[in-house]
Amino acid sequence: MGRFISVSFGLLVLLLSLSGTGANCLPDWSVYEGYCYKVFKERMNWADAEKFCTKQHKDGHLVSFRNSKEVDFVISLAFPMLKNDLVWIGLTDYWRDCNWEWSDGAQLDYKAWDNERHCFIYKNTDNQWTRRDCTWTFSFVCKCPA
């Protein structure tokens, strides 16, 4: 009986410790609404950052946003690490065909940008999306399904 209680308690502790850390996410990634996120301080151009994210997870991409709450969550991750830095996101017209799309194929139904260039960054300080030349280098956020 004592062993059963000890094993049960151990399993409970393990379950509770995994539940808040994104048990389905890679180590050091954060979970929100069924997706895993990680901020990377390394500076890369848009294409290299996207390629890096796809190497982290088979379904990984630069972050896409479906609503303002998701943006707020990502800012809560990125701001402590990057402060006022600009961060690549997965929105692009990389092929310059006037077809704006998320690199992960998500629907483009939430928008917050100005008009210029072909790849997007967001500003941690004011949640503005701004276009930049895709060859510039910035930190970035990767996202993948949990």
Swiss-Prot record:
Disulfide bonds join 25-36, 53-142, 119-134. InterPro entries: C-type_lectin-like, C-type_lectin-like/link_sf, C-type_lectin/snaclec_domain, CTDL_fold. GO terms for molecular function: toxin activity. Residues 1-23 form the signal peptide. Keywords: Disulfide bond, Hemostasis impairing toxin, Platelet aggregation activating toxin, Platelet aggregation inhibiting toxin, Secreted, Signal, Toxin. Residues 32-143 form the C-type lectin domain. It holds the Pfam family Lectin_C. SUPFAM superfamilies: C-type lectin-like. It is found in: Secreted. GO terms for cellular component: extracellular region. Expressed by the venom gland. Its main location: secreted. Binding of echicetin to glycoprotein Ibalpha (GP1BA) receptor on platelets alone results in inhibition of platelet aggregation, while binding to both GPIba receptor and IgMk promotes platelet aggregation and signal transduction. Belongs to the snaclec family. Heterodimer of subunits alpha and beta; disulfide-linked. This is Snaclec echicetin subunit beta.
